């Protein structure tokens, strides 16, 4: 695990296109803002270029301050295009139906966005389906716009596929109603268990007038190849490091038994395989926590108590003791030295 640093995540620089367009629609030039964060036009032209989630959140927050619009995330979603999601988005644009477009955006999400906290999902039942975005709590001025832009962006993108408006039956958002709550659709509920939008079967069944079967199949093959390349895992330790991300939350640390259950193998088998790789579950857990803690402290404004909660520590004090053991300095000292 020491050679495989755990990161918060990253996303395609294509997402900057909709952010810039939203800023421009408010009468502001986005170029100085993007240059301030190292996003020169030449960087945005690079195929496959990615942007760290922490930097994206800082840019989004700065854009909100620049425009004076706390609901800017909703506007970002409204101007979102499928092409901004790269190969996955272009493939979704060729899907035969809205349903298949939604499934494509979800299945191939790692091609344009990755976060250790989890992955988006699609849940269909007899009455319709939910497109669900994973939790990125705790919420603040730096990340609420991410939820806003993504859910609103999904609706915009699926409407493009259908060639007509695709409305959500219900919009559910995890964080409490913000000051700009009046800017959301009337059917929005806050303080919910998930970030998700509800689509009817009638909308999911809408056909894509631009669908070409052969092009669709070719693009799907390319997506599968790229997904396999991006998600290829060399060791069991790396696989466990990925699983720990979504499990590290809520003020409690995940156990070997929980991880073994996720892998669908007995705990003793997992322990034996890790020994064969020359590592232990506790070492992987500590390395994962250390890497994430360093990134949170360096790249975000989260309080140490919030970081402790996200990394499964029972208290801020327990987290600070562990961090000093790992890095020989306190979290406060680490943040100060990294920002000088």
Which residues does each predicted region cover?
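Hydrophobic alpha-helical core bundles mediating ligand binding, dimerization, or RNAP-core interactions
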Residues: 60, 151-154, 223
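Internal, well-ordered alpha-helical segments in soluble enzyme and binding-protein domains
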Residues: 101, 150-153, 215
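Extended mid-to-C-terminal alpha-helical interaction segments
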Residues: 177-340
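DNA-contacting interfaces and partner/effector-binding or oligomerization modules
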Residues: 117-206
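N-terminal low-complexity or simple alpha-helical regulatory segments
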Residues: 1-128
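Short hinge/gating elements
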Residues: 86-92, 136-140, 223-227
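Short acidic/histidine-centered micro-motifs embedded in hydrophobic/aromatic stretches
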Residues: 36-40, 174, 310
